[in-house]
Amino acid sequence: MKLLYTDIRTSLTEILTREAEELVAAGKRVFYIAPNSLSFEKERAVLECLSQQASFSITVTRFAQMARYLVLNDLPAKTILDDIGLGLAFYKCLAELNPKDLRVYGAIKQDPQLIQQLIELYHEMTKSQMNFLDLENLTDEDKRADLLLIFEKVTAYLNQGQLAQGSQLSHLIEAIENDKVSSDFNQIALVIDGFTRFSAEEERVVDLLHGKGVEIVIGAYASKKAYTSPFSEGNLYQASVKFLHHLASKYQTPAQDCSQTHEKMDSFDKASRLLESSYDFSELALDVDEKDRENLQIWSCLTQKEELELVARSIRQKLHENSDLSYKHFRILLGDVASYQLSLKTIFDQYQIPFYLGRSEAMAHHPLTQFVESILALKRYRFRQEDLINLLRTDLYTDLSQSDIDAFEQYIRYLGINGLPAFQQTFTKSHHGKFNLERLNVLRLRILAPLETLFASRKQKAENLLQKWSVFLKEGAVTKQLQDLTTTLEAVEQERQAEVWKAFCHVLEQFATVFAGSQVSLEDFLALLHSGMSLSQYRTIPATVDTVLVQSYDLIAPLTADFVYAIGLTQDNLPKISQNTSLLTDEERQNLNQATEEGVQLLIASSENLKKNRYTMLSLVNSARKQLFLSAPSLFNESESKESAYLQELIHFGFRRREKRMNHKGLSKEDMGSYHSLLSSLVAYHQQGEMSDTEQDLTFVKVLSRVIGKKLDQQGLENPAIPTSPSSKTLAKDTLQALYPAKQEFYLSTSGLTEFYRNEYSYFLRYVLGLQEELRLHPDARSHGNFLHRIFERALQLPNEDSFDQRLEQAIQETSQEREFEAIYQESLEAQFTKEVLLDVARTTGHILRHNPAIETIKEEANFGGKDQAFIQLDNGRSVFVRGKVDRIDRLKANGAIGVVDYKSSLTQFQFPHFFNGLNSQLPTYLAALKREGEQNFFGAMYLEMAEPVQSLMAVKSLAGAVVEASKSMKYQGLFLEKESSYLGEFYNKNKANQLTDEEFQLLLDYNAYLYKKAAEKILAGRFAINPYTENGRSIAPYVQQHQAITGFEANYHLGQARFLEKLDLADGKRLVGEKLKQAWLEKIREELNR
């Protein structure tokens, strides 16, 4: 046993490679062992350090893979399960347990997260050399009983199926202990690099090999000052020093100092010594100069995106300045990989920098996993429509074109069908011939045939089920679709898809192994397959060595690359505090460690945090050979963040924080990194909205435009203007002539007017282009409204001989029997329930009509408008016509005054602010239209809410009080003529704010005509701005911005072009209510009309 340590600015790999070469010269076969996270990288580093650049006698590997290189004899032939197979085994065993048998985990026994935690605990106990029976020492009786039962069941199953238990390393330990290794230990040597602690399993291997006479060399980084210090607690090197002291004590071998004498202390050595001095409370006087600050830079950026752009520019600039540099000389370290992953790809592709993020990718979100999930959902939930649509959207099932899939989806959404029997029936319903039923039935059979065959499978042996699954994949064209998908992709993506397919096949192989000879139902098979795929991960290797490697900062080793950029070093990310998320608490781990024999040790993450994080920081500071950049954003994941305390310490030592910003207001030579990034910079420059007028900038932009123009001309493209915000074009004259011929009447409805003032472009989409909502055969808000309207229309038309309640019930019965409504509301139990709710609403609303003796209804569903009477006249002489339908017209019995009623499904009131801004013209339009038809005497226009009143019982003292409060909400809401209000009863909300004099009434009608005139002039001129209104000046309501995917309008970027609603100018800032508020708005209307 030989122990070595060296200062952190001397390459430990070089020293250990020399040791390995000496061992080879002595006739040894050397295994160069590196940690799992560094083995791939360490192999390249060792090859670079070898004097011959190669050696057949040195194998760079990991502890777990050593068994592959040793000859093991007479071991029983057992199949080894990986995490996927182990997960399936846990799933199978837990499925067989009764939930009542598990006191803690019974309700979640097949939850994927629980299974994942059980797998992790299984591995942890294996690595720590702990037996599952050791769990008897747990103090929590319920948890102890559950875990022992689960592991006992799984262990018995693995033994029964001749499936190997434990890890590869545990099998090697078993082989060495039982003398099953025929390799000559005297010819083997181990060189161990990069460790600061061994797991119990790794330490056991080292111990056994040492006992067999294997020469072992172990190296670590440590300063002589730290190693010889009697007190190491809190020291930066605490992790490595304790590791060396433990080994030195165990094997009675002092560690040798291999540190080299450096002619000059470099910037990173200086920073390391200052940090070490800070943590061991010793005094050290070192000056940090400008060269040090240049070599070790600390950046403060605004956002993560800005960080990545600055890094990309810096790399591009260095490559431009030094032709000897290549991408492999750069390394990027991330504070949080998940937060940077998406932006990293976007920005580095933009700057055309090849990179490799050495991280396994989960299959959970791959279309193949979604494909299996959709089939499982179809089986489990009995063929829901949504699950079938999700299956088709994966683009992996059947070889149907996208247009066929869209047509099929549109039709089944129209039908609203669910359940396999419904899909098996021939499609016969169509909406006025809109659907091609013949084609849709062909698609239906193509989609259903493979699924029907698969779903007919009963519980059977796993082997037979896999054969049926294979046939299904073939008949469903899944393999063909995957093949077609990959042929159109780039080489890197093709490799990625190939790895995904391998992972998918591996899950099936593990299933076949675990369930060999077992009876499995189709649903269980699909659930297991989905569970296995959700746990699966895949990874690709870089296509070329010359790439920028990207990794998490806590996996870095000293002296890794010439230039290192560590970004995202916020207080939350550096240091990383490991959290215990396993099934065993830290306290339980401590108790188990104390109760078991020496050498059996579960890791307690919280006890390792401090020494691990300090050593990581030391490695980070020394990761670069030439230049190191440490960066922290002020905003991390859209939340304010602070830079790490470690960075603040470096600043305290004399290193300088540099405020780094992307400057899009000016362009410089730094923007010439790559063609794509140059275009991006130009776009950002234009989007600033303010062009610099300096001669230098203007010249640069002109030259840049010419260069880009030539490049685009070579590609046969135009050089378009770069838009700064979504905009629309005015319609051409010939288009307007075709849409609105001069001799043809121009009609504008009240709903069209409201849509125009909500967003002019929405009016264009709906009323000019005719954009329609998806058709639905099932009842919706429109059909519910028609149903209630028809009931009241019929009830009020019936003779008055019978009581109102009798007439209402007769109207309900007759309307329910109408063919249209009978087809809708008898189709399903859900529709029948909806009908019952609507009938309750009808009976409740009838309360107002039943007890209102002051009025009589003279018309129902009355049409108004038409060619006979123009609504308004435009300045150019063209007439605008308005037509529509009034739900009901009432007449006062006292004097014959007319009132208009409009039914609403929710509480609706007339609001002067909305009316002024064109958003509430319905009632004034009805009154104006009737006035043009000869009516002169009005008592008002109002809304009637058709809904059951809801009253909170907490807000009232008694049930009688609840009835009183509920009746208050059941009133007509709207506008009333002051002179007629005395004739109206309690069912009318006729407060002062809702009452108008004759002059005020006419003022409203005049302003309403003005709103129609303004809208009509813009529509006939073909001008439709993208200007959704904003009520609060900060956001756009969802119902206003319904066509965002078409317009591209985003409130956070384009709020400036939204229409801000007009408001009252209140000089004293007092809030007006009631009559004063009405008068203020009427005055504003007068001012607007007098302009």
Swiss-Prot record:
GO terms for biological process: double-strand break repair via homologous recombination. It is an enzyme of class 3 (hydrolase). InterPro entries: ADDB_N, DNA_helicase_suRexB, P-loop_NTPase, PDDEXK_AddAB-type, Restrct_endonuc-II-like. Its EC number is 3.1.-.-. The keyword Membrane does not apply. Keywords: ATP-binding, DNA damage, DNA repair, DNA-binding, Exonuclease, Helicase, Hydrolase, Nuclease, Nucleotide-binding. Gene3D superfamilies: P-loop containing nucleotide triphosphate hydrolases. Its cofactor is Mg(2+). One of its GO terms (molecular function) is 5'-3' exonuclease activity. The heterodimer acts as both an ATP-dependent DNA helicase and an ATP-dependent, dual-direction single-stranded exonuclease. Recognizes the chi site generating a DNA molecule suitable for the initiation of homologous recombination. This subunit has 5' -> 3' nuclease activity but not helicase activity. Despite having helicase-like domains, this subunit does not have helicase activity. Heterodimer of AddA and RexB. Belongs to the helicase family. AddB/RexB type 2 subfamily. This is ATP-dependent helicase/deoxyribonuclease subunit B. It comes from Streptococcus pneumoniae (strain CGSP14).
